[in-house]
Amino acid sequence: MNQNLHVLSMDSLPVGLRFRPTDEELIRYYLRRKINGHDDDVKAIREIDICKWEPWDLPDFSVIKTKDSEWLYFCPLDRKYPSGSRQNRATVAGYWKATGKDRKIKSGKTNIIGVKRTLVFHAGRAPRGTRTNWIIHEYRATEDDLSGTNPGQSPFVICKLFKKEELVLGEEDSKSDEVEEPAVSSPTVEVTKSEVSEVIKTEDVKRHDIAESSLVISGDSHSDACDEATTAELVDFKWYPELESLDFTLFSPLHSQVQSELGSSYNTFQPGSSNFSGNNNNSFQIQTQYGTNEVDTYISDFLDSILKSPDEDPEKHKYVLQSGFDVVAPDQIAQVCQQGSAVDMSNDVSVTGIQIKSRQAQPSGYTNDYIAQGNGPRRLRLQSNFNGINTKNPELQAIKREAEDTVGESIKKRCGKLMRSKNVTGFVFKKITSVKCSYGGLFRAAVVAVVFLMSVCSLTVDFRASAVS
């Protein structure tokens, strides 16, 4: 029996049998024997460095040929650095990137024998690699006796390679599309998207037309006495008369104008008219085109009260401002302002209950100066004249004498050769007193003072040099 199993080929496995060891079996049996050097016991899994090959080339190196998209390999640990634990997972076309957390593999319930890590192949170079469907589950032993550093051991890991099929996603999408498709009443009729869009567009147009037609009909459906309106009559506004210009005098309508508008009916409004039709109650009525209305004896007074309000000033709205503007000189405006200010603005207290107090007239000179723009009187003169300051000022004389005495005493104590500074001091004060106290004069005075200080400093330096020598 053992001899028959020994000669049995891997390709001739019975239908239904597959090489699918569990995670615990991969570590406790296959990985343990490979690390300890028992290669003959694990010939079903080939040893290969996955970083030297691309993922789409690895399925051809599998010992067991299978139609399933899963392949197992022993992979030696390729350290990226000799003294580190980081592995080199880069290939020519891309790199393997670890994702997620390491999952523990237990033997029983508590004994941890290894970990499983997920790697995803990215085409290109980090960090701009493109994720692919090639995935590896890396199985690593965590027990101390399988560290791979003991005598007779070699560090290995088991890599389970598999590829996610894109067809699965396509089938799921097709199923979702079938669910989302709307129900059709007749399964034999096929309607394309273009036809549906055309139907929707035509329905929108019809609804729009119906809305427009309803606007035309809605105004006529409740009227029995008026003629039917058409769309052209509703839209055409050209029959409206043009608005006349308002450049004319406004006035209350005269009785003649009211009579021309009302015709013969106006005669019935007069108190002495005999065109009223009486009834048993001695009430008067007037016949108009809209029926009969009761009228009062003093209907004319009532019309006057409507056409002209008693509270309004009859002269207030007599004229309307004509179109355009006239250019008026400033002098004329000032004259108008003076005239307007002198007018008494008193109103009829009995009508409005408000009395407006008149404003006092302003002097003509001030008005003229205010109207004239850009002339001198509107400007403020900030410059002052200090011509009265001269050398006869006692304060300047005292300052001059004090400065002369101070400089003279210091020079006499140091050296008699420096007496010429007195002349310099006098020259400086002459310049200062001759300069007017203006902005430019102050600047020139500052310059002279600086020159004076520089001369004093130079004389002091010369004196010290002569004293040292």
From Swiss-Prot:
Induction per UniProt is: By salt, drought stress, abscisic acid (ABA), salicylic acid (SA) and methyl methanesulfonate (MMS) treatment.
Location comes to: Cell membrane; Nucleus
* Keywords, ordered alphabetically: Activator, Cell membrane, DNA-binding, Membrane, Nucleus, Phosphoprotein, Stress response, Transcription, Transcription regulation, Transmembrane, Transmembrane helix
Domain NAC, residue spans? 13-164
Q: How is it modified after translation?
A: Phosphorylated at Thr-142 by SRK2C/SNRK2.8. Phosphorylation at Thr-142 is required for nuclear import.
Gene Ontology BP, a term:
cellular response to cold
Q: Does the keyword Transmembrane helix apply?
A: yes
Spell out the molecular function terms from Gene Ontology: DNA-binding transcription factor activity; transcription cis-regulatory region binding
- The ranges the UniProt entry gives for DNA binding are 113-170
Kindly give the PANTHER family that the UniProt entry links to this protein. Answer: NAC TRANSCRIPTION FACTOR (PTHR31744:SF216), PROTEIN CUP-SHAPED COTYLEDON 2-RELATED (PTHR31744)
Q: What does this protein do?
A: Transcriptional activator activated by proteolytic cleavage through regulated intramembrane proteolysis (RIP). Transcriptional activator involved in response to cold stress. Mediates induction of pathogenesis-related (PR) genes independently of salicylic signaling in response to cold. Binds directly to the PR gene promoters and enhances plant resistance to pathogen infection, incorporating cold signals into pathogen resistance responses. Plays a regulatory role in abscisic acid (ABA)-mediated drought-resistance response.
The protein in question is named: NAC domain-containing protein 62
Q: Which organism is the protein's source?
A: Arabidopsis thaliana
